Regions:
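Sequence/structural signature of outer-membrane beta-barrel proteins
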Residues: 4-8, 43-45, 57-67, 85-89, ...
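Flexible, glycine/proline-enriched loop segments at strand-loop-helix junctions
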Residues: 24-25, 65-69
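Transmembrane beta-barrel domains of Gram-negative outer membranes and organellar outer membranes
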Residues: 1-58, 78-89, 133-137, 165
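"Short basic amphipathic alpha-helical interaction patches in structured regions
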Residues: 52-54, 67-71
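Transmembrane beta-barrel strands of outer-membrane/channel proteins
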Residues: 1-3, 51-59, 96-106, 124, ...
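Outer membrane beta-barrel transmembrane domains
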Residues: 10-23, 111-116, 120-192
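Detector for outer-membrane/organellar transmembrane beta-barrel domains
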Residues: 71-144
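Weak global preference for isoleucine
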Residues: 28, 34-36, 53, 57, ...
């Protein structure tokens, strides 16, 4: 389960106008959409590749639709993720891994002619680990059929530090096509 508990934002008047939003800053507290995901490992091999499939659904429960923060539409997606260690230390505390993703993404739109948009999703990236630190970088996006801003490409980076079952995460995302925005986030993850 993934959920944006609280978001505070600030954007320029130009960005507000491009998004047809009302405010440039968050005037009230609000919550984000809820995403429920299931992951299934279908192959685990040191010699070949590891492979997982996932099924995901996003609710339409987020707030501040008037400021283009979340959507009032559900979506779902399925994907296959494969990865392989390119290098691993003898003690297993350090590694470099390559991974790739391909899938299908579907979401509801507010277009009266095309009530739904579908896309092929893709991604490729690398992950480096050293003791409790993990640095991941990848290039990912999807390719929708309407070609109306539905073909974004993002360069995503994530630095995490794990202490026992607690993870502190810092993320940076750079939009390269259709979604030309910079995003920074700080997160806490509790592993059960």
């Amino acid at each position: 389960v993934n959920w944006c508990f609280k978001e505070k934002y600030k954007m320029t008047p130009e960005t507000r106008d491009e998004r047809f939003a009302v405010e440039t800053e968050s005037p009230i507290k609000y919550n984000g959409d809820i995403v429920i995901s299931s992951f299934f490992q279908v192959l685990k091999s040191e010699k070949w590749v590891d492979a997982t499939i996932s099924a995901n659904i996003k609710t339409a429960s987020g707030g501040r639709l008037c400021d283009a923060r979340f959507t009032d539409a559900a979506s779902y997606w399925f994907d296959v993720n494969v990865g392989r260690n390119l290098w691993k230390s003898a003690d297993g505390k350090a590694s470099i891994r390559m991974q790739a993703l391909a899938g299908f993404y579907c979401w509801m739109t507010n277009d009266m002619v095309h009530r739904q948009n579908d896309a092929i999703s893709y991604g490729v990236g690398f992950t480096g680990k050293y003791r409790g630190f993990t640095l991941a970088t990848n290039l990912a996006g999807f390719y929708g059929y309407e070609n109306n801003g539905d073909r974004p490409i993002h360069w995503r980076n994530n630095l995490r530090y794990e202490i026992k079952k607690n993870i502190i995460s810092f993320r940076y995302t750079h939009g390269m096509k259709d979604n030309l925005y910079e995003t920074y986030s700080l997160g806490y993850i509790r592993c059960f």
